[in-house]
Amino acid sequence: MAVQTLDDLLNAGVEGRAVLVRSDLNVPLDGDRITDPGRIIASAPTLKALAEAGAKVIVTAHLGRPKGEPDPQYSLAPVAVKLAEVLGRNVQLAGDVVGQDALARAEGLTDGDVLLLENIRFDPRETSKDEAERTKLAKALVELVGDDGAFVSDGFGVVHRAQASVYEVAKLLPHYAGKLVEAEIKVLGKLTEEPERPYAVVLGGSKVSDKLAVIEALAPKVDTLVIGGGMYYTFLAAQGVSVGNSLCEESMIDTCKALLEQYADVIHIPQDVVIADSFSADAESKIVSVLEIPDGWMGLDIGPQSVRRFAAILTSAKTVFWNGPMGVFEFEKFAAGTKGVAEAIIEATGKGAYSVVGGGDSAAAVRQLGLPEDGFSHISTGGGASLEYLEGKELPGIAVLEG
C-alpha cells in the first residue's frame, strides 16, 4: 500500500502532538445499550498506540444517520463509555463537534489524553455535496489539532465516502493509514490480486440492486458464487417460479435472468427454503422445495438441503469471501442457513482456506450466533467499503491517503 502508516507516524514521534483520528464507531444500539461493540474493539489498537506514545488523541466518528443537527438518540455518549472501557483509560466526550466545548477540551489535553468529539454527522457539512462546505468543516477539525497535528484515517467503514472527516481533512494535514485501514486493504488485496483457488464467494442480504455491481464484478473472476438471503427470490422469480410473498425486486428480474444464463456454471442458488406465513419470530414455518412456495407465504431462510450442498462447495474452497446472511438470522427459526454456511466457511478455514467476512450483517451474525470470530481469517468492519473495493471502484478515503 503506497501510503504512510501509523508506524511511520509513531516513528516520527507523536509525544506532545495532537493527532486527529477518524474512527468507525458506528455500532448498533438498543436504547443506549451497545448490542455489538465490534467496531469499537477494532478501532482500539490505533487509539491505544497513539495514547501510549504520548499523543493528544482527538477522535471523530459518526453514529447512525442524524439529519445534520444534534439528536440525542445519536449521541456518542454510550460509545465514549465503552471506548474508555476497551482502552482502559479515560475518554472525554465533547458536547459538540467543532464548537466551543470541543475547542476548550482540545486545548486542555495533556499527553496521552483521549477526546471523542460528538457525532460528526450532527454537522451538516460532513455529508454536504458542496466541497467548499466540507472543506470548512475540515478546517475546523484541523484547528483542533493545530499546526503540528496529524491525521490518521482508521474508519474503514467510511473510506468509500468523500466526506469532510474522511477526505477533505486528509488534504489539510500529514496523513496516515491507521492499523485497521492498513489491515483491511492488505486483506482485500489478497482477494483481488492472486486468490488461491478454488475461490468461492457467498452473497446474501435483501436486495439484488445492492449487490448487482459486485455480482457483475466477481462472477467472471471466481469459481463459485453462492446466492442466498432475500435477494435470492428475485433470481427464483427470474426462472418463472412463484415466490409467494417473498421479497422480490420486479425491476431486477430480467437482470437476474441474464446473470443466471451467462454464469450458469458459477452461480449456485438454493433448492429448498424455509418459509413462513408472516414476518415474525414466532411465525408458522416449514421447509419446502423452491418450486412449492404457496401464495401468502414468504421465504425467510435457505433450507437444510441447500446448506449441505453449499457446505460441500465451501469446505473444498481455498479462498472464501462472504457478505450477507442467508436468511433472517435475527429470528432463531430462520438462522440455521446462515449458521450452516458460516460453519462451513470455518471448516474450510481450519483446512487452510483464506476466509473473509465482509462486514455489516454478516459480522453481526457471527457474533449473534455465537460463532468463533477467530474461525475466520478476517472479519471486515466495512461492508459497503469492502464491496466497492471488490467492484474495482476507487475509494476516496484511500485514494486521498495515496496523494
UniProtKB/Swiss-Prot annotation:
The keyword Repeat does not apply. Its EC number is 2.7.2.3. Substrate binds at residues 24-26, 39, 62-65, 121, 161. InterPro entries: Phosphoglycerate_kinase, Phosphoglycerate_kinase_N, Phosphoglycerate_kinase_sf. Keywords: ATP-binding, Cytoplasm, Glycolysis, Kinase, Nucleotide-binding, Transferase. Belongs to the phosphoglycerate kinase family. This is Phosphoglycerate kinase. It comes from Rhodococcus jostii (strain RHA1). The lineage of its organism: Bacteria, Bacillati, Actinomycetota, Actinomycetes, Mycobacteriales. The gene is pgk.
